[in-house]
Every structure is written in structure tokens, then in C-alpha cells.
Curated annotation (Swiss-Prot):
GO terms for cellular component: cytosol. It catalyses: H2O2 + AH2 = A + 2 H2O; 2 H2O2 = O2 + 2 H2O. Keywords: Heme, Hydrogen peroxide, Iron, Metal-binding, Oxidoreductase, Peroxidase. It is an enzyme of class 1 (oxidoreductase). Its EC number is 1.11.1.21. Formation of the three residue Trp-Tyr-Met cross-link is important for the catalase, but not the peroxidase activity of the enzyme. This is Catalase-peroxidase. There is a cross-link at residues 105-226 (Tryptophyl-tyrosyl-methioninium (Trp-Tyr) (with M-252)).
Length: 726
């Protein structure tokens, strides 16, 4: 459960760095383009995390480097660190167990299943905004405590893996048996720009739970991981928090049992910190002065640390053994009567009025206090459905332990994608449905098999449009955020993907490809679907006068329906796919922005997006067979006609609907309608950056380059989920 400081209610601003006034003449200063045009298309989102920002270079292989790691020694060092209390940030009860669990939780807890973004997979807690979120107060200290260990092991362990492993080791050190740990999270070197954290301009702005279902947001307030621990909008009412808790945990794909287990398990250890009013707390790390060296929230209250620490403003210790695993959370929750009170900082919390003083003080062994809980902890007792689960865990501690172990593993690995990406000696053998499991390959097609399959596909009567469209439909579900989707598994043939409106082509094409599969009884349908795209593109390139062999990596397998979580895969259904000129809803951003969103999920660069759209238009791959954007008189030929005709000044474009979504291109002299288009087409002529790219492919000398670039980008998309090739 998230804890937060409710006094951080405005965006942080650092002090002016100028000593003598005047204008800032440094690079990047001054009024920017987005200041003038705030709705400017974010093409820059496709350029983040390039090799230009990576100090390790493009040849660095994290999996190879991790294989050199002394994993046992690393865990030993982490265990020793847990009780190595530092005077600059003393450990509660002499242990950093609670702090490291919170660090791992808050790193993973930003994940949202609706768009697959967020999570712990990139080590984003090092960067703004997460490093300075109100809910992450004092986690800068946790990361700084880990630095000597990171320094020792260098690139053999990423920050992203280290954060989660530290949380696991903390749990194990408390006596808890975890479900396992999978490494494989690779660091990035700059903040993620694509994650939509919300449009609020003030920290802790309240959001209604119903609104969370309509947007890719994971928390009920800007700057929180989950919910306000004082109740919705500081209501102090446990029962009113139930909807918010379900909404936020549900956005991570957690059900009620997993939610109860995570809240209770996370609050079995450690404490919150609210020694005094938040007015004593200084600037967050991003706004702190340069001499603070990346640390923030310096406190002027007392020593500012230890017993005087202020983190969330709440002062809660849940259990009698805050550094050792127990079932005391549930025992205390149901054993005592709880009355609303306030922390020394003024935050709303609850105290067990009829309990003896049984909670140890974190720094004075001679002192004890009554059990305390957050408003949202009591939700587990007063919400009828949560209460049933909580009472079961109260009476069956082993069931609670098992549920928390699995839920914690899911929380910390949810954004890693299939288990093929996991590395390390503690990867669990069990396949879990949320990992989108795949069967083991039974057969690897030979080169002769591939030649015969291509011949069968070519002779099947399928059109170029159908072959290319079905391959794209299969592969384009991939999401770079949580590594879900893609062509491996042939889930296009399963529910729910086979029934999506955007995949209408599958109903016509898959039966043909399935018949071809039956004749071989060896190759997977997943491989055959991708191979159909290969055949279609090679035919289209040949028709354009370019002979090219499209690379194909066999080895895909076919998933079963029972390996496919229909509810979770439903989240992969696109709101829009500009590559196929598909748009389901008009109430979510602009068509061109959603094209950028889709391209970013597919990890495409701006040039790759541009060449793919141009190629797919002339191949006639619109989801509904429309002629929108098909700026060619020779469909099925892999030509540069899309770009040449879009940029041709003979045509004038005007909208044909009130929403400005559909357009006609008329001959300026005759008034004749030559082409029709959507915003996903015209953006390549209207946006200055995309027009510059389109001009490259519209030039007379670009034909062969266009085909080669299209094939390279196409193969990239087809192989995005081939983690078996790593």
C-alpha cells in the first residue's frame, strides 16, 4: 500500500541557479517549440533510449554479463547490508527490511496492465518524476544505501534487477520464503517519456476510481503508487477506499485475493514515518540544491533521521515483530477495536484503542506503543469481500504466505513478459498464466520445409494484401512496455484476438493457412502466419522491380487456449492502429497521437514507422479494405507512391466529416476526387518532422532504399517477441 506526504501539493521548483540575473544562454534554454504549440505531435517519443544515451554501447550484452555474477555472494552482501545501519539514515530496529521492500514495491507498482507501461523493468525509479514523487519520499536513501553493492558488482547486475532483488532478500531475511526471482531487467539511462502519468498540475490531485478505468493511470492521485492511505481525498473512511483499491490493483491485473495478500504482506514488516509536520521537509531530489547530490527531502525536525524522520506523514507500525514475518497483521486487524486518530504530522490513521502497548519502538527498546493501522488497512476488515479473504488468511497463515509469495512475484515480474526473458538460478519452474506461457517447440523447420511452405502459401490464392495483413495482425499486438503480445503463439487464432474488429482479415485467411499446416503437420501456425507475410512482401517487391529475400527465423510455437488469459489479452486490443487505418474510439487523443503511441509500443523509430505506413498503404492492408491512404494506381506493388502522391502539390485536401477524421484529395485544376485519407495518412505531410522523412522516400532515387528499409522494419516487428533467440 502506498504512503504519502499530503503536504507536497504543488509541483517542485528548484531555486534559480543564476547569481546575477540575466538571461539563460545555455543550450536548450529559452522558449521551446512546445511552449508555442503545446499540442505538437510527440514524434520525439520514438527517439528515446537510443545508443546515444547508453554509456555501455550497443555491443553490451547484459545476459552474458549477468552470467559472470557471483549470485550467492551478491545476496550475501545484500543480507549484510540489511543490518548495517548507517548514521546518515539509521535503520528502524537496526534493519532496512521495510525500506527495501518499499523500494522494490514502489518500483514495480507503477505498472499498468491497460497499456503495459510503468513497472520496475527499466530501473526508472532513478529518474524524474518517480525519484521525486511524494509517494517515494526517502527511497532516495534506499537507493543510496545500495550504491556500494552496485559499485562492487558493476554491470553484472543492473539497477533494475538490484532494486527488486533487494526487496526479495529483505523478505527472505525476515523469515519469509519467496516464490523465486528472475533477473533480466536491463537499465536505461534517461527517463521514460512515453508514460502518461496524468494531466494534473499539482501533486496528490484526487481522481475518482471510475476515471481510472478510462485512462492508463495506476493511482488515485498524481504522485501516488496506488491509493491515498488516508482514504479517498483524505476521507478517513475505510469502507470508501474499497473501490479505489480495487481500481488501482485491478489496473495491475490483481484480483481481490492478490490485493489483500499484497497489502497485508507489505504491511507485516516495517513502518511509516511521520514524526512531525511536513513543513519541516525540504525539496525533493529533482529540486534540491546541487550540493545535496541527488538526495532530497532533508528535514529540519530534530536530527531529521531515525526517530525524527518524516516520510509519509503517517506514524504507523502494524505488527509486534516489524522485522520478522508473522501473521500479526491479520491478528491485530480483527482482534482490536480501532479508533481514528492523527499522527504527529496530522495525518489520519487508526489506533487499537483496547490493545496493550505491544509494539516495539524502532529506536528505544524501553518504549512500546499500541498497534496502529492506515485507513486503507481497515478496508480489508470492513469491505465484505476483502473481509472474507482476510479472515481466511487469519485462520490459515500458510494460505496467506502462499498467496503473498505468488502475488509478490507477480507484482515484481509482471512487466518482464514471457519467462524466456528470465535469467538466474532462482527462476521458478512453474508456468504462470499471466506470463503468457508457450509450449516447448517440437520441430524446427528446415530450409527445405520453408521453401515448400512458401510455395504452398504462394499457390493458396491469398492476395498480397491478405498475406501481409494477417502477419501484421499477429505480430503487431506486441507491447514494448511489458513485452506482451506478438506473433509467437499464434494467438491470433484464439480468443479474444480472433474476434477483434481490427482482425477481420483473420477469418478469411487463417482457415487457408491452417489447411497448409495440416499438410505439413510439422510447422507451427505461428511460423506459417509470419511466413505468409514474407511471401506477400517478396511478391510485392518483385512487382516493383526489386528482388529481395525477406529474412525469416523459424521456431515459433502455437499456444493453447488454456494458456491464454482472455481478460488480460483483451487489454491488447488496439484503440487505434494507424498502420491499418483503424480507429475504434474518438474520445481518446488524436488519431496521429495514437499512431505514435502504437509505434512506440512496437519500439519503432520515426523512420521505421514512416516506411511501414507508406508500404502498408500501397499493399492495401487497411483493416476494412478501404481506400483511405492508398495513394497508388497499382496496389500490391511495394512502391513509394504513398509518399510521392501525398506530397504532390497537384492535390488539395479537405475534411469530409465534422470530426475532421476523413479527407478528400482533389485535383486543384479539375476538382476531381483522386484519393481519400485519414489523419494517420495526412500527418506525414502536415507534421514537419514526418514530412522531412516522407520527402526522403518520395525522391526519385529512393525506390530501392524504401524496399530495403521496409523489409528491415517489417522483420523487426515480426521478431519483437522472439526472446528465444536472445
Amino acid at each position: 500500500m502506498s504512503t504519502t506526504d499530503d503536504t507536497h501539493n504543488t509541483l517542485s521548483t528548484g531555486k534559480c541557479p543564476f547569481h546575477q540575473g540575466g538571461h539563460d544562454r545555455s543550450a536548450g534554454a529559452g522558449t521551446a517549440s512546445r511552449d508555442w504549440w503545446p499540442n505538437q505531435l510527440r514524434v520525439d517519443l520514438l527517439n528515446q533510449h537510443s545508443n546515444r544515451s547508453n554509456p555501455l554501447g550497443e555491443d553490451f550484452d547484459y545476459r552474458k554479463e549477468f552470467s559472470k555474477l557471483d549470485y550467492s555472494a551478491l545476496k550475501g552482501d545484500l543480507k549484510a547490508l540489511l543490518t548495517d545501519s548507517q548514521p546518515w539514515w539509521p535503520a528502524d530496529w537496526g534493519s532496512y527490511v521495510g525500506l527495501f521492500i518499499r523500494m522494490a514495491w514502489h518500483g514495480a507498482g507503477t505498472y499498468r496492465s491497460i497499456d503495459g507501461r510503468g513497472g520496475a523493468g527499466r530501473g526508472q525509479q532513478r529518474f524524474a518524476p518517480l525519484n521525486s514523487w511524494p509517494d517515494n519520499v526517502s527511497l532516495d536513501k534506499a537507493r543510496r544505501l545500495l550504491w556500494p553493492i552496485k559499485q562492487k558488482y558493476g554491470q553484472k547486475i543492473s539497477w533494475a534487477d538490484l532494486f527488486i532483488l533487494a526487496g526479495n532478500v529483505a523478505l527472505e531475511n525476515s523469515g519469509f520464503r519467496t516464490f523465486g526471482f528472475g533477473a533480466g531487467r536491463e537499465d536505461v539511462w534517461e527517463p521514460d517519456l512515453d508514460v502518461n502519468w496524468g494531466d494534473e498540475k499539482a501533486w496528490l490531485t484526487h481522481r475518482h476510481p471510475e476515471a481510472l478505468a478510462k485512462a492508463p493511470l495506476g493511482a488515485t492521485e498524481m504522485g501516488l503508487i496506488y491509493v491515498n492511505p488516508e482514504g479517498p481525498d483524505h476521507s478517513g473512511e475505510p469502507l470508501s477506499a474499497a473501490a479505489a483499491i480495487r481500481a488501482t490493483f485491478g489496473n495491475m491485473g490483481m484480483n481481490d485475493e492478490e490485493t489483500v495478500a499484497l497489502i497485508a504482506g507489505g504491511h507485516t514488516l516495517g513502518k511509516t514515518h511521520g514524526a512531525a509536520a511536513a513543513s519541516h521537509v525540504g525539496a525533493d531530489p529533482e529540486a534540491a540544491p546541487i550540493e545535496a547530490q541527488g538526495l532530497g527531502w532533508a528535514s529540519s525536525y530534530g536530527s531529521g533521521v531515525g526517530a525524527d524522520a518524516i516520510t509519509s506523514g503517517l506514524e504507523v507500525v502494524w505488527t509486534q515483530t516489524p522485522t520478522q514475518w508473522s501473521n500479526y497483521f491479520f491478528e491485530n486487524l480483527f482482534k482490536y477495536e480501532w479508533v481514528q486518530t492523527r499522527s504527529p504530522a496530522g495525518a489520519i490513521q487508526f489506533e487499537a484503542v483496547d490493545a496493550p502497548d505491544i509494539i516495539p519502538d524502532p529506536f528505544d527498546p524501553s518504549k512500546k506503543r499500541k498497534p496502529t493501522m492506515l485507513v486503507t488497512d481497515l478496508t480489508l476488515r470492513f469491505d465484505p469481500e476483502f473481509e472474507k479473504i482476510s479472515r481466511r488468511f487469519l485462520n490459515d497463515p500458510q494460505a496467506f504466505n502462499e498467496a503473498f509469495a505468488r502475488a509478490w512475484f507477480k507484482l515484481t515480474h509482471r512487466d518482464m513478459g514471457p519467462k524466456a526473458r528470465y535469467i538466474g538460478p532462482e527462476v521458478p519452474k512453474e508456468d504462470l498464466i499471466w506470463q503468457d506461457p508457450l509450449p516447448q517447440p517440437l520441430y524446427q523447420p528446415t530450409q527445405e520445409d520453408i521453401i515448400n511452405l512458401k510455395a504452398a502459401i504462394a499457390a493458396s490464392g491469398l492476395s498480397i494484401s491478405e498475406m501481409v495483413s494477417v502477419a501484421w495482425a499477429s505480430a503487431s499486438t506486441f507491447r514494448g512496455g511489458d513485452k506482451r503480445g506478438g506473433a509467437n503463439g499464434a494467438r491470433l487464432a484464439l480468443a479474444p484476438q480472433r474476434d477483434w474488429e481490427v482482425n477481420a482479415v483473420a477469418a478469411r485467411v487463417l482457415p487457408v493457412l491452417e489447411e497448409i499446416q495440416k499438410t505439413t503437420n510439422k510447422a507451427s501456425l505461428a511460423d506459417i502466419i509470419v511466413l505468409a507475410g514474407v511471401v506477400g512482401i517478396e511478391q510485392a517487391a518483385a512487382a516493383a522491380g526489386v528482388s529481395i529475400s525477406v529474412p525469416f527465423a523459424p521456431g515459433r510455437v502455437d499456444a493453447r487456449q488454456d494458456q491464454t488469459d482472455i481478460e488480460m489479452f483483451s487489454l491488447l486490443e488496439p484503440i487505434a492502429d494507424g498502420f491499418r487505418n483503424y480507429r475504434a474510439r474518438l474520445d481518446v487523443s488524436t488519431t496521429e497521437s495514437l499512431l505514435i503511441d502504437k509505434a512506440q509500443q512496437l519500439t519503432l523509430t520515426a523512420p521505421e514507422m514512416t516506411v511501414l505506413v507508406g508500404g502498408m498503404r500501397v499493399l492495401g492492408t487497411n483493416f476494412d479494405g478501404s481506400q483511405n491512404g492508398v495513394f497508388t494506381d497499382r496496389p500490391g506493388v511495394l512502391s513509394t507512391d504513398f509518399f510521392a502522391n501525398l506530397l504532390d502539390m497537384r492535390y488539395e485536401w479537405k475534411p469530409t466529416d465534422d470530426a475532421n477524421e476523413l479527407f478528400e484529395g482533389r485535383d486543384r485544376l479539375t476538382g476531381e476526387v483522386k484519393y481519400t485519407a485519414t489523419r494517420a495518412d495526412l500527418v506525414f505531410g502536415s507534421n514537419s518532422v514526418l514530412r522531412a522523412l516522407a520527402e526522403v522516400y518520395a525522391c526519385s532515387d529512393a525506390h530501392e532504399k524504401f524496399v530495403k528499409d521496409f523489409v528491415a522494419a517489417w522483420v523487426k516487428v515480426m521478431n519483437l517477441d522472439r526472446f528465444d533467440l536472445l
